[in-house]
Design a protein with these regions (language model features):
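Non-catalytic ligand/cofactor/substrate-binding and regulatory segments of enzyme domains
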Residues: 2-117, 126-183
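Conserved catalytic core of nucleotide polymerization and phosphodiester-bond processing enzymes
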Residues: 121
């Protein structure tokens, strides 16, 4: 899904990384709620002239039932889903490529507390030096990277710098370009 970006020249292109969060219980620190455990997706956009390619993906388990808690991982298209809070980061071409490389080569395994969608998006940001905040939150007696933690960290980021492009009003994620179709 990431090969699409090479179809647009990088000279004079604009590069954007977005984070979208579906909170488990919107506006709270609860790690389980109406939206189950919640979800965090990452969106990558490259624009040159009038051509834009956007891919929005999420990191998921392949298992079902209780096997979903710890299984092999998969990357799925996350375009066209509702989200509660989102953040936009304008990055360099070099940072963008590092994020693409990370997303295109995801960790082989998913674990609901040790390496989940929140940890994946945070890791992608770290790979490209994108200031996506650390989504670590309390889980029972321990800690883990969670969608609720990401939402809280984004709100904290916005409180510290009101000029950041963080949308607390939610909305619908635009559709992805899918398997490398330029529109």
């Amino acid at each position: 899904m990431m090969e699409c970006f090479s179809k647009i020249t990088s000279a004079n292109a604009a590069f954007v990384v977005r984070v979208y969060v579906v909170e488990p219980q919107p506006g709270t620190a609860f790690n389980v709620g109406a939206n189950s455990f919640g979800h965090v997706a990452i969106s990558l956009s490259k624009t040159s002239g009038s051509t834009t390619i956007t891919q929005t993906v999420g990191f998921y388990p392949t298992g079902s039932g209780l096997d979903r808690l710890s299984s092999k991982s998969q990357i799925l298209d996350n375009g066209d889903i509702e989200y509660g809070i989102g953040a936009t980061y304008y990055v360099t071409g070099e940072s963008f490529q590092k994020v693409i490389n990370y997303v295109a080569n995801p960790p082989a395994n998913y674990h609901f507390t040790d390496f989940n969608c929140s940890a994946f998006v945070y890791g992608a940001g770290q790979a490209g030096s994108v200031p996506i905040p650390d989504p670590t939150a309390v889980i029972g007696l321990g800690f883990g990277k969670t969608p609720a933690g990401m939402a809280s960290a984004l709100r904290d980021q916005k409180a510290k710098n009101p000029n950041l492009d963080i949308n607390e009003g939610g909305g619908r994620i635009p559709g992805s370009n899918g398997p490398c179709k330029i529109e």
